[in-house]
């Protein structure tokens, strides 16, 4: 079984979404923009584009669809159903549908789709269009039974080509050949080497490739290591990065992209959100766990061991060129690692669905991820060699990654990042322990959204036969029962409390202080104080 899922690019949807266009071109360094419109819509197009707020020095030209774009065009805007013109070079393409008929299909070659809700007021129109647009990404038609809820404006980015299934590792060679990559650096860890997974990858590639391997990535990606890997990348004149491993390896590759963007200066200069420009370095990611979803996200979490904290970087340009999900790579993953990485994916999906940054597309992705986790997590722990469960877990992790990458997360990650930084506890273990306690704390602020999650976790019948006020508590109870079940299935290694992951009460103060500086805190649906964090740590202990 093998599927190729093409990137859907960026969708910007909301009232007056056109006003965001200037930023999208600016962040890509594009100054010469050509807008193409049907001749009958030229006046409307001019009026609409006047709402843009381009950077000084940006030149926007509007032409009819029967004209050729100027040779110096760096970016294209296609108005309505205007066809994609030929240009001297490949340009980013932004499309603005103007009438409902323009939504009949999304033409190939569109990088950014702008859905201005002023043009699509008919109830359910955008709901239906978005479900169909992302049908392939979800691996099937959306089973989400509720109307999509649209905030004032939102953006969803999915720029990574995905190859998913069984025995898909051999597809990497085709990707490298297509992108003319001949001298990549392969980043991994020694566990991957010891398991024989690296040999399998290298054996599948063209022996004529000039590959250098760096297998010294630690369990937490590290600022200093990223610096030395970047120096090697330049010194050996590499032309691409392959990352094979768990979340630490994948985030290390993203850290290299940030460092290359800065020319080797302090990576912390770009800590935060949306400070990166597009990178010319092609990156290919091959996850060997099913939890972080880092191969699909706009996020990199990198350890700063000097400060004992995790640093967060967010940019759509951190998404890799392509990702390969091969079920055979996770079959050797021990039950304990399967369980905690699976709960990491669950925390991503649940927080994406309940945090302040949620949007209709992150809801669809999170929902499908939870359906897959319900079907496959316990089974993958109990029957690790069955490809159907490994395959389901790989896609669940990827979908949950795409969801939270575009909605962000909340206090589970706020506190979990702090515990990881202060105590060195595994991230997935932190997520497993904290998730039910965080949902209890946020409960009154997320009553409706939390209650809906009873459907993917326990089925529509359970949802319909449970009183509205009891649905949220039923979800929390189910997650606790799942943790206990995984605890038993892993011979007691899957944690249900903080004391099981070497957290001590004497660490609580440092954890709470670090948590208050975590960027995910702002997306939590309920305010969280130092005292609140201390109480939650006590409860989870």
Task: State what each model feature region is.
Residues 18-19, 43-45, 82-89, 102-104, ...:
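Short glycine/serine/threonine-rich phosphate/pyrophosphate-binding segments
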Residues 70-100, 233-274, 280-288, 415:
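A short, small-residue-rich loop immediately preceding and capping a beta-strand
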Residues 97-139, 151-152, 262-358, 449-452, ...:
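A glycine/threonine-rich phosphate-anchoring loop and its flanking beta-alpha core
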Residues 291, 399-431, 518-522:
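Glycine-rich phosphate/pyrophosphate-binding beta-alpha loops
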Residues 336-399, 403:
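C-terminal and late-domain segments of enzyme folds
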Residues 436-541:
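Mobile late-domain/C-terminal helix-loop "cap" segments
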């Amino acid at each position: 079984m093998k599927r190729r899922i093409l990137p859907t690019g960026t969708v910007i949807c909301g009232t007056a979404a056109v006003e965001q266009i200037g930023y999208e071109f600016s962040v890509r360094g594009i100054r010469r923009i050509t807008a193409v419109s049907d001749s009958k819509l030229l006046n409307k197009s001019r009026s609409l584009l006047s709402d843009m707020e381009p950077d000084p020095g940006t030149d926007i030209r509007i032409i009819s669809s029967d004209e050729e774009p100027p040779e110096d065009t760096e970016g294209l805007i296609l108005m309505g159903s205007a066809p994609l013109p030929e240009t001297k070079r490949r340009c980013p393409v932004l499309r603005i549908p103007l009438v409902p008929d323009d939504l009949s299909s999304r033409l190939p070659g569109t990088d950014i789709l702008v859905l201005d809700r002023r043009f699509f007021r008919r109830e359910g129109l955008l709901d239906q269009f978005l479900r169909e647009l992302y049908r392939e990404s979800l691996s099937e038609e959306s089973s989400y039974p509720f109307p999509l809820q649209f905030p004032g404006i939102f953006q969803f980015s999915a720029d990574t080509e995905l190859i998913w299934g069984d025995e898909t590792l051999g597809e990497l060679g085709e990707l490298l050949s297509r992108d003319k990559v001949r001298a990549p650096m392969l980043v991994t860890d020694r566990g991957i080497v010891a398991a024989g997974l690296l040999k399998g990858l290298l054996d599948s590639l063209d022996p004529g490739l000039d590959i250098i391997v760096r297998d010294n990535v630690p369990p937490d990606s590290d600022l200093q290591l990223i610096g030395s890997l970047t120096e090697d990348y330049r010194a050996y004149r590499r032309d691409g990065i392959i990352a094979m491993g768990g979340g630490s390896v994948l985030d290390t590759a993203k850290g290299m992209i940030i460092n290359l963007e800065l020319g080797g200066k302090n990576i912390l200069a770009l800590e935060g959100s949306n400070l990166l420009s597009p990178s010319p370095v092609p990156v290919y990611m091959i996850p060997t766990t099913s939890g972080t979803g880092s191969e699909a996200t706009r996020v990199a979490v990198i350890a700063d061991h000097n400060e004992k904290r995790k640093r967060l970087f967010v940019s759509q340009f951190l998404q890799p060129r392509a990702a390969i999900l091969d079920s055979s790579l996770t079959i050797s993953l021990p039950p304990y690692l399967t369980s905690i990485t699976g709960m990491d994916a669950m925390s991503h999906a649940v927080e994406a669905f309940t945090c302040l940054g949620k949007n209709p597309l992150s809801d669809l992705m999170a929902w499908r991820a939870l359906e897959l986790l319900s079907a496959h997590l316990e089974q993958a722990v109990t029957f690790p060699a069955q490809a159907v469960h490994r395959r389901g877990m790989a896609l669940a992790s990827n979908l949950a990654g795409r969801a939270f990458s575009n909605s962000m997360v909340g206090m589970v990650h706020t506190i979990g990042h702090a515990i990881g930084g202060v105590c060195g506890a595994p991230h997935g273990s932190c997520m497993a322990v904290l998730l039910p306690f965080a949902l209890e704390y946020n409960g009154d602020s997320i009553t409706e959204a939390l209650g809906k999650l009873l459907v993917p976790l326990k089925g529509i019948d359970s949802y319909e036969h449970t009183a509205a006020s009891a649905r949220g508590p039923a979800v929390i109870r189910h997650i606790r029962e799942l943790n206990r079940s995984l605890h038993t299935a892993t011979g007691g290694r899957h944690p249900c409390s903080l004391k099981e992951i070497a957290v001590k009460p004497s660490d609580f103060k440092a954890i709470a202080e670090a948590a208050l500086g975590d960027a995910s805190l702002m997306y939590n649906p309920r305010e969280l104080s130092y005292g609140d964090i201390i109480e939650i740590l006590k409860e989870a202990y």
